Amino acid sequence: MSFGIICYKVENGEIRYVMIQRKDSLAFMEFVRGKYNQTDINYIKQLVDYMTENEKEMLLENTFDAIWNYTWCQSSQNIFKHTKEYIESKTKFDYVINNMCFVNVIKSSKVKCNYLEQEWGFPKGRKKVRENDIDCAIREFCEETQLYKDDIQIAKEINPFQEIFFGTNNILYKHVYYIAKIVKEKSKIFLDNNCLEQVREVRDIKWLTYAEVLSHIKYHNIERIEIFKKAHTIITDSLLL
């Protein structure tokens, strides 16, 4: 379960929302971390179909270590390469990348690639030990936007929205979003290359209008589209009075 914030501000009479673009697609991350059965070519094909063209090229043209370093933004000598996850993920990668069936899956998928960029969404993340829901949402929001806690005000009178769906791995996911507004006019969102928590997860960040938000959410994220529409209606009808 993840907790996040749908944050808005009013600029020149128009509501705008903070959206972040993931650094990597969920499918790419799942593949790099070895979250698959290495003999299940159908599921691997499904993962590949949800990757961007650049991610597919990366798998074909780079060693596992290079991909791992890129994914976690770490040096080639990082000690985490001795972890169980690294060893198991590398073993699976080496197995499938040397299988011509897998290589052909990527090449055929590249021809019909529908995903030109990583997905956009609202800042969110998972709780730390003994962290409550709203504190998690605020911390993740601040890490991913570089805003401060006192830059925003949570609308505590509005019940949080729940995005519940089954992922491509058939696992049920639940994202909980609070509504918040910007209370400091000079607050700025930006990418900080020195903030590891942000650069590992975020590729881009923008303020977007209602129409732009809808155009940035991928068509298969039906639940995200619906909760955003509901949130926008409540903000328009109740919070701007």
Please place each PLM-identified region on the residue numbering.
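Short, charged/polar surface micro-motifs in flexible loops or helix N-caps
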Residues: 12-13, 24-27, 183-187
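Nudix hydrolase/Nudix homology domain
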Residues: 30, 65-68, 72-73, 110-124, ...
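Conserved Nudix-box catalytic region and its N-terminal flanking loop in Nudix hydrolases
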Residues: 16-139, 143, 147
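A structure-centric signal for secondary-structure junctions around beta-strands
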Residues: 2, 14-16, 117, 202
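Eukaryotic beta-rich interaction modules
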Residues: 1-2, 157
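Short beta-strand scaffold segments in enzyme catalytic cores
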Residues: 3-7
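A short coil-to-beta-strand element that immediately follows conserved catalytic motifs
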Residues: 148-159
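A short catalytic or substrate-binding loop motif that flags glycine-/basic-rich loops and adjacent residues
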Residues: 1, 11, 170-172
